[in-house]
């Protein structure tokens, strides 16, 4: 499936080494100011080749808006966006044309479709995420109309985990580190993996402030379930946590429950969601990324004829996919919330009366 969302819908298309990547966003209310500079800023944060901690593939990632916007405002019709691929080097993949790269989707795509685009993984490449970030930027514009702010940053690289979360600092950090005190150690881990022709995993934290209570569609489109689906649909994400996450299974109920007083919740172990519905607290979501599977160490594998081969990868690859992946995770959370915001508009009769009985 290449379409995401129920009311705020995004369809993406394109491959890593094709002409480009694009998306169509449907369901956007008319009259939303489309800030192209904000879209550009988010694309720049995800863009490759920014520093030594990301892939050296160079892409301008300039977004061309094809439809759905007139004089800076959404028209209510589908918004089409296109991002050209300008930095492809398909020759880097000639030696693995018939070889399944360990840790990649080569084998599974081949088993499903009987054919695969070996140039950078084709549709399965993380290059596709450029369209998600463009669409996510539009979703964030809608959320900002309601003072909902989505932020992201890196909370851990390898086994080095930050103890404090400073989202303002993450905006300035080369690796989007949330904890200044352990940033240099986290950078060193990435540099060490790169020197060894290896890669390293990491985790991103996404925080949403200003989210009203009531968003989520139980039972089968819960907010936490939708977030899990969105984030687990990203390349390299292997686990998602909300609030205290996995630690919750070690806690007592008296420890985990978020008690309330006249000022609201006194803690936030639930991460802003109860019963699949937002509770008005800050939404806290972690996405855990595996190490980039493209490493320059020879590995054992099979070819399309199921003959044993040695895979020797060439090209330009992220030593830690979590760094740029954090921006994509932020975009996906924004897309989920924009969708939930529109769905919630019909959840009570009084909401409809405000529109139709003025």
Curated annotation (Swiss-Prot):
Belongs to the chorismate synthase family. Reduced FMN (FMNH(2)). GO terms for biological process: amino acid biosynthetic process; aromatic amino acid family biosynthetic process; chorismate biosynthetic process. The keyword Transmembrane helix does not apply. Its cofactor is FMNH2. This reaction introduces a second double bond into the aromatic ring system. Pathway: Metabolic intermediate biosynthesis; chorismate biosynthesis; chorismate from D-erythrose 4-phosphate and phosphoenolpyruvate: step 7/7. The lineage of its organism: Bacteria, Pseudomonadati, Campylobacterota, Epsilonproteobacteria, Campylobacterales. NADP(+) binds at residue 46. It comes from Helicobacter hepaticus (strain ATCC 51449 / 3B1). It comes from the Bacteria. Pfam families: Chorismate_synt (PF01264). The gene is aroC. Homotetramer. The keyword Ubl conjugation does not apply. This is Chorismate synthase. InterPro entries: Chorismate_synth, Chorismate_synth_AroC_sf, Chorismate_synthase_CS.
């Amino acid at each position: 499936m290449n379409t995401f969302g129920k009311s705020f819908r995004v369809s993406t298309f394109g491959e890593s080494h094709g002409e480009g990547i694009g998306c169509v966003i449907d369901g956007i209310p008319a009259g939303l100011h489309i800030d192209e500079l904000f879209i550009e800023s988010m694309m720049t944060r995800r863009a490759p080749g920014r520093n030594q901690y990301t892939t050296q593939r160079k892409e301008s990632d300039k977004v061309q808006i094809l439809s759905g916007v007139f004089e800076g405002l959404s028209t209510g019709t589908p918004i089409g966006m296109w991002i050209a691929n300008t930095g492809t080097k398909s020759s880097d993949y000639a030696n693995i044309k018939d070889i399944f790269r360990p840790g990649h989707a080569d084998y599974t795509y081949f088993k499903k479709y009987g054919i695969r685009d070996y140039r950078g993984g084709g549709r399965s490449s993380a290059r596709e995420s450029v369209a998600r970030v463009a669409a996510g930027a539009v979703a964030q514009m809608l959320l900002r109309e309601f003072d909902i702010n989505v932020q992201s940053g890196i909370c851990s690289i390898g086994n080095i985990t930050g103890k404090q979360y400073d989202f303002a600092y993450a905006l300035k950090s080369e690796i989007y580190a949330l904890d200044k005190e352990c940033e240099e150690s986290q950078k060193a881990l990435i540099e060490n993996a790169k020197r060894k022709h290896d890669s390293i995993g990491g985790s991103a934290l996404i925080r949403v402030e200003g989210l009203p209570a009531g968003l989520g569609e139980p039972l089968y489109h819960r907010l936490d379930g939708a977030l899990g689906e969105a984030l687990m649909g990203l390349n390299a994400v292997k686990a998602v946590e909300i609030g205290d996450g996995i630690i919750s299974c070690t806690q007592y109920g008296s420890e985990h429950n978020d008690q309330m007083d006249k000022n609201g919740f006194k803690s936030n172990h639930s991460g802003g969601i109860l019963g699949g519905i937002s509770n008005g607290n800050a939404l806290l979501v972690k996405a855990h990324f595996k190490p980039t599977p493209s490493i320059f160490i020879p590995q054992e594998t099979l070819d399309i004829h199921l003959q044993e081969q040695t895979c020797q990868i060439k090209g330009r690859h992220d030593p830690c996919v979590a760094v740029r992946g954090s921006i994509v995770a932020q975009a996906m959370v924004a897309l989920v919330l924009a969708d939930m915001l529109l769905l919630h508009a019909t959840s009570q009769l009084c909401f409809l009366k405000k529109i139709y009985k003025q």
